[in-house]
Design a protein with these regions (language model features):
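Hydrophobic ligand-binding cavity/cleft-lining segments
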Residues: 1-45
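Charge-dense, helix-prone N-terminal extensions
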Residues: 4-9, 49-54, 62-65, 72, ...
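Short beta-edge strand/loop motif at the mouth of beta-sheet-based domains
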Residues: 13-14, 33-70
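Hydrophobic/aromatic beta-strand elements that line small-molecule binding cavities or substrate pockets
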Residues: 16, 48-51, 73-79, 103-111
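Hydrophobic pocket/interface hotspot
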Residues: 25, 35, 59, 77, ...
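Short amphipathic alpha-helical signal-transduction/dimerization elements
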Residues: 30, 143-151
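Short, conserved beta-turn/loop elements at beta-strand boundaries and strand-helix junctions
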Residues: 81-86, 114
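Beta-strand/loop substructures that line and gate deep hydrophobic ligand-binding cavities in soluble
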Residues: 89-140
Length: 152
């Protein structure tokens, strides 16, 4: 996996080559039953997952984090272009009432030889270095889990 970190306020880019065709990977992002398996950091427990996958539709995921508190991640789909592109806003709400500023996630799926897919995740709009680093850890775990979801 490649990780590219740019100056604060810009973007985080992660790539992963997966053992599945783009349509299957797109479904893993858009089907709640599939995304519930992998779209959560390894040290967290997913409590709920709601996906209204259409432009203007909302998504919402609640998870229990290692300290026992509940964090809600949510946003709105800006672009849904199966099987190769998904764009959505990304917000975090914490048990103590904090709400992070909205950011933007773009998922691009490129077909590779042998029925494989290159997944590129771009997360932009971070407000500071600490936020970007924190999201890098979370997304890296999710990328490991989606890779495991499509074993060789």
């Amino acid at each position: 996996m490649n990780v590219v970190l740019k100056p604060a306020g810009q973007e985080l880019v992660l790539t992963r080559d997966l053992n599945a065709a783009p349509a299957r990977v797109f479904a893993a992002w858009t089907d709640p039953r599939q995304s519930s398996v992998w779209w959560v950091p390894k040290d967290c427990t997913l409590l709920s997952c709601e996906l209204d996958v259409r432009e203007g539709g909302a998504w919402r995921r609640r998870m229990r984090v290692p300290d026992g508190s509940v964090v809600t991640k949510h946003g709105v789909y800006r672009e849904v272009s199966p099987p190769d592109r998904l764009v959505f806003t990304y917000n975090s709400e914490y048990a103590d009432g904090r709400i992070d500023p909205e950011t933007l996630v773009t998922i691009t799926l490129a077909e590779l030889a042998g029925g494989r897919t290159r997944l590129t995740l771009r997360h932009s709009g971070f407000w500071d270095e600490a936020s970007r680093v924190s999201h890098t850890g979370g997304w890296t775990g999710a990328m490991e889990r989606i890779s495991d979801f499509f074993p060789a």
